[in-house]
């Protein structure tokens, strides 16, 4: 079983914690990671883009000038694509970009992302994380103790004081463990997670 240090909010190690090898010590599957990240980003797209083709643009029903004898290039409609205010060739239309990923692949990707954080030494486990009131200064001091800059912080439950303490800090995101996803794990350089959140992850993915 992989073992990592257990720290308090001040950045001092208070012990060690053993992680479940079925979650934090698996073979990293880069293909699954890629597939899941692509799907997550695709599913975020609104798909509301739209433009008019030459058949949908208003006007242009009459030939702008006769075919021959003017010395100008022949034209059939002022709404042809080459005209200003003309239609768009292969105009984008609203569409659904949603991609479906099998549950088994999502689980493999999640375990791979968590394992990569442990392997890279970028995972910090906190004994607990709580603030009586939102305190950005204290939060910054905690991050400095772990030399954390671009950081994802995962808590066991939604904590308003913790969230408000971090929301104005650039490159830092706080999410409850129920909202964890592969993209965020890979996007942020360091992962700071509470002991209770680790237990919840192991319950679901072990």
Curated annotation (Swiss-Prot):
InterPro entries tied to this protein: Ribosomal_uL4, Ribosomal_uL4-like, Ribosomal_uL4_dom_sf
Intrachain S-S bonds: none
Alphabetized UniProt keyword annotations: Ribonucleoprotein, Ribosomal protein, RNA-binding, rRNA-binding
Pfam families to which the protein is assigned, alphabetical: Ribosomal_L4 (PF00573)
UniProt GO BP: translation
Domain of life: Bacteria
Region of interest called Disordered, as start-end residue ranges on this chain: 49-76
Similarity section: Belongs to the universal ribosomal protein uL4 family.
Subunit relationships: Part of the 50S ribosomal subunit.
Protein task: One of the primary rRNA binding proteins, this protein initially binds near the 5'-end of the 23S rRNA. It is important during the early stages of 50S assembly. It makes multiple contacts with different domains of the 23S rRNA in the assembled 50S subunit and ribosome.
Annotated NCBIfam families: rplD_bact
Protein name stated in the entry: Large ribosomal subunit protein uL4
Originating species: Clostridium botulinum (strain Eklund 17B / Type B)
């Amino acid at each position: 079983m992989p073992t990592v240090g257990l720290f308090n909010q001040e950045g001092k190690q208070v012990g060690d914690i053993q992680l479940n090898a079925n979650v934090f010590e698996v073979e990293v599957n880069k293909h699954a990671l890629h597939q899941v990240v692509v799907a997550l980003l695709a599913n975020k797209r609104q798909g509301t883009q739209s433009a008019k083709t030459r058949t949908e643009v208003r006007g242009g029903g009459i030939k702008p000038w006769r075919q021959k004898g003017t010395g100008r290039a022949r034209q059939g409609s002022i709404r042809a694509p080459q005209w200003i205010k003309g239609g768009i060739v292969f105009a984008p239309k609203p569409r659904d970009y949603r991609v479906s990923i099998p549950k088994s692949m999502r689980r493999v990707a999640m375990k791979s992302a968590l394992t990569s954080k442990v392997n890279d030494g970028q995972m910090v486990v906190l004994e607990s994380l709580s603030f009586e009131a939102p305190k950005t200064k204290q939060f910054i001091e905690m991050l400095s103790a772990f030399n954390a800059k671009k950081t994802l912080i995962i808590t066991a439950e939604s904590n308003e004081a913790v969230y408000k303490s971090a929301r104005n800090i650039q490159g830092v995101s706080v999410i409850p463990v129920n909202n964890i996803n592969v993209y965020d794990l890979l996007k942020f350089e360091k992962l700071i997670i509470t002991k209770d959140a680790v237990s919840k992850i192991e319950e679901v993915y072990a």
